[in-house]
Curated annotation (Swiss-Prot):
It comes from Bacillus subtilis (strain 168). This is Uncharacterized membrane protein YoyG. Keywords: Membrane, Transmembrane, Transmembrane helix. The keyword Membrane applies. It is a single-pass membrane protein. The gene is yoyG. Belongs to the SscA family. The keyword Lipid biosynthesis does not apply.
């Protein structure tokens, strides 16, 4: 997508893990808010 041939997908320390952590953090906040409310 961005011109990287294998850097974005071949390595786990790229942006994919960062996006995954952000998504999990947002889901955790949503679930926590749902249980609190």
């Amino acid at each position: 997508m961005y011109g990287y041939s294998g850097y974005g997908y071949g390595f786990g320390c790229g942006t994919n893990t960062f996006v995954l952590i952000v998504v999990l953090f947002i889901l955790l906040i949503i679930v926590g808010a749902a249980f609190i409310c």
